[in-house]
Curated annotation (Swiss-Prot):
Keywords: 4Fe-4S, Cytoplasm, Iron, Iron-sulfur, Metal-binding, S-adenosyl-L-methionine, Transferase. Its cofactor is [4Fe-4S] cluster. Catalyzes the methylthiolation of an aspartic acid residue of ribosomal protein uS12. Residues 1-117 form the MTTase N-terminal domain. InterPro entries: Elp3/MiaA/NifB-like_rSAM, Methylthiotransferase, Methylthiotransferase_CS, Methylthiotransferase_N, Methylthiotransferase_N_sf, NA-bd_OB-fold, Ribosomal_uS12_MeSTrfase_RimO, rSAM. Binds 2 [4Fe-4S] clusters. One cluster is coordinated with 3 cysteines and an exchangeable S-adenosyl-L-methionine. Residues 373-440 form the TRAM domain. The keyword Transferase applies. It comes from Lachnoclostridium phytofermentans (strain ATCC 700394 / DSM 18823 / ISDg). Residues 140-370 form the Radical SAM core domain. One of its GO terms (cellular component) is cytosol. It holds the Pfam family UPF0004. This is Ribosomal protein uS12 methylthiotransferase RimO.
Length: 440
């Protein structure tokens, strides 16, 4: 019995996919990379924004075609789209044989058995349920880095975001389970752990009554084989001195923080339901750069939010110029049904959203190149990710670069390097968002 699996959306969704793959493999099913020969296809979906929703629907319909042309006996849809649009999917896509909600992935093998038995079925647990399933995750990222999801859900309820309704309230994974999972990943060859959640900085508050991310980091740093630990999805108002101290004192933790701020205008931040303001953001970023001079800061912004005036946009542009983020992504606002922002007046046209996005990225482009040029001559520790077609050129990442979202360094060397290997590289040239260097 062959199973083909597609994982869409964010890295948090990917972790769910890897857990399901582990359960499927442990059950004795064969995993295949060829959808045309699959008996069962599982699509783990995303619907965070409109484009993600469309991609998920199109993928489901594309896979459904194999019921006509292939050996497909069952099509299973899991994840956020299944959670949010259960009734619509069942009514409008008859080719779908089963649905699993965002908290039901531990039931995947049971659902597969039912589908193979000819049953159309579904599995939905309480949205605040936290699975305790233990499995040997299938690492799909190449084996040398992996995401560690430390919590599920979110309590922030930003006005543009549907996640709390789909994923439930914030639930921290018990620390002992995370340490056990990290050890398992390390034993499998993982050298870089990337901590993720809808928000990482309040980890532990629900379980232990206080923020426990610093303590978790210390325990993870003690695991043999792990060389890099990277933290993503930090809410700015939750970053405290203890977290900064751990970043400074633990050498395995990359001097890199992903801090999605979304905007810099106080009016827009308030409309978004964000719990910070321009002055606090400037104070935090200034402090981080003072305490950790080589820190690389990544952020993401939303442009074209309802009610965003030209003045708000100019405030954001000036903020980007002054803060000079090492890494930055800009997204146009996506109007999501059942969110407060979708009901707001003064919705911005797509043309204006895209124009403002372009202006911000042009500013960041110049900053990124200047920052890249400043790295020329420096020696950096680089994780090798693979080899390019050209002989002697490898691609890797520095501590400043998270996989899939940041830049790369192209490494020239006479040696034969392996994926996951760490080498010292001298930067010789700067590109727009990438670096070029040599390894002796």
């Amino acid at each position: 019995m062959k199973i083909f699996f597609i994982s869409l959306g964010c890295d948090k969704n990917l972790v769910d996919s890897e857990v399901m793959l582990g359960l499927i493999r442990d059950r004795g099913f064969e995993l295949t990379n060829d959808e045309s020969e699959a008996d069962i296809i599982v699509v783990n979906t995303c619907c965070f924004i409109h484009d993600a929703k469309e991609e998920s629907i199109n993928t489901i319909l594309e896979m459904a075609e194999y019921k006509k042309s292939g050996s497909l006996k069952g099509l299973i849809v899991t994840g956020c789209l299944a959670q949010r649009y259960k009734e619509d999917i069942l009514a409008e896509i008859p080719e779908v044989d089963a649905l699993l909600g965002t908290t039901s992935y531990d039931a995947i093998t049971e659902v597969i058995d039912k589908v193979l038995g000819g049953e159309r079925t579904e599995s939905f647990k309480d949205v605040d349920y936290l699975s305790e399933v233990k499995t040997n995750r299938v690492n799909t990222t190449g084996g040398y880095y992996s995401f560690l999801k430390i919590a599920e859900g979110c309590d922030k309820h930003c006005t543009y975001c549907i996640i709390p309704k789909i994923r439930g309230d914030y639930r921290s994974v018990p620390m002992e389970r995370l340490v056990e999972e990290a050890k398992f990943l390390s034993e499998g060859g993982v050298k870089e752990l990337i901590l993720i959640a809808q928000e990482t900085t309040v980890y532990g508050v629900d379980l232990y009554g206080k923020k426990m991310l610093p303590e978790l980091l210390r325990k993870l740093c003690a695991i043999d084989g792990i060389e890099w630990i990277r933290i993503q999805y930090c809410y700015p108002e939750e970053i405290n001195d203890e977290l900064i101290d751990v970043l400074k004192s633990e050498t395995k933790i990359c001097h890199y923080l992903d801090i999605p701020i979304q905007h810099a205008s106080d009016d827009i931040l308030k409309r978004m339901g964000r719990r910070t303001n321009n002055e606090e953001l400037v104070t935090l970023i200034t402090k981080l750069r003072k305490e950790i001079p080589d820190i690389a800061l990544r952020t993401s912004l939303i442009t074209g939010f309802p009610g965003e005036t030209e003045e708000d946009h100019e405030i954001l542009k000036e903020f980007v110029r002054k803060m000079r983020f090492e890494r930055l992504g800009v997204f146009t606002y996506s109007k999501e049904e059942d969110t407060p922002a979708a009901k707001m007046k003064d919705q911005i046209t797509k043309k204006v959203k895209v124009a403002r996005q372009k202006e911000l990225m042009e500013i960041q482009q110049g900053i990124a190149f200047e920052r890249a040029e400043s790295m020329v001559g420096r020696k950096l520790k680089v994780m090798i990710e693979g080899k390019l077609v050209e002989d002697g050129i490898f691609i890797g990442r520095t501590y400043m670069d998270a996989p899939n979202i940041d830049g790369y360094i192209f490494v020239h060397t006479k040696d034969e390097l392996m994926s996951g290997e760490f080498v010292e590289v001298t930067v010789t040239e700067a590109k727009e968002y990438d670096l070029i260097g040599t390894a002796e």
